[in-house]
Amino acid sequence: MNKQLYKNLLANELTKIKKENRYRIFNEIKKDDSFPLAKKAYKNKFKDILIWCSNDYLGMSRNKLSIKRAKECLDNYGIGSGGTRNISGTHSPLVRLEDDLANLHCKQKALVFTSGYVANESTIGALTTIFKDSIIFSDEKNHASIISGIKKNKCEKYIFNHNDMIDLENKLSLVDINRPKIIIFESIYSMDGSIGDLAGIVNLSKKYNAFTYVDEVHAVGMYGKTGAGISEKLNLQNNIDIIQGTLAKAFGTIGGYIASDDLVCDAIRSTASGFIFTTSLPPLVAESARASIEYLKSNSELRIKQQENVKFLKNELLKH
């Protein structure tokens, strides 16, 4: 059997990626105890570096409380969860984590996924299946995971100009008031760091009878009195149908989630393939995430300091 055909196709794709300067090289990193100091592998040695590109925004991956709780959980539960949520993977730390996330966002229920990407792709895909003949309204700068979820069922969609409420309303006005509509947006956009117009979207959703879905991955842990994100800061949590977030950035662990009411979460857990057909998060990850959420709810110093640092650096850069 000649495999050269397949080798050529793979090599051609890599050549194309390299010509477009999209080929990625991974850096081997060894974290130090003091974030953001680290070491990078270089010619069989490690050299000291300062990390500017991490999404461990507050250094919570090295938080002593989170590490302590993870170690205790490891002793009590072992390493893996041992199954999907439908069989033996719904362990106590995961149940408590979902309770904590629901409480954080002032929602009835939360569901934890293996990543933020999976949370978006699976939930949006499930929604467009459940809401028959639905139409999506998506900000043009939404994340790849959102785009993938929208494409999953090839539903009808409108892409509105970034943060442009006039354009969004013009598109909403074209659709029958009784047709299912889902507005999907981010609270902080990874493409340019802009803040989403949450209040504007909430107002339009009420006017045009639309379901709202906000991605808060860059905001949870970072904004709001208890670290629940921009929706908390603007007191809009009760006006947004689904709040999606991650445990992998400010909370310093891994995993993604949605928070909503009982009915929504029950429907998603029963239909979203990315939730159903995969092994759940390990207990020690769930418990360390709980510790991070607990810490950031009652300690605002880290996020205040981070915002002060951002302001200082921005001002210094503007001088040069």
List PLM regions with ranges.
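Active-site PLP attachment segment
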Residues: 226, 232-267
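Conserved N-terminal alpha-helix of the aminotransferase class I/II PLP-enzyme fold
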Residues: 67-115
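Conserved PLP-dependent catalytic core of the aminotransferase class-I/II
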Residues: 196, 290-320
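N-terminal "arm"/small-domain region of PLP-dependent enzymes with the aminotransferase-like
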Residues: 2, 12, 16-77, 179, ...
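Conserved PLP-anchoring active-site segment centered on the Schiff-base-forming lysine
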Residues: 124-144
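Active-site phosphate-binding strand-loop segment of PLP-dependent enzymes
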Residues: 56, 158, 162-214
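Substrate-binding/gating loop at the entrance of the active-site cleft, primarily
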Residues: 115, 137-153
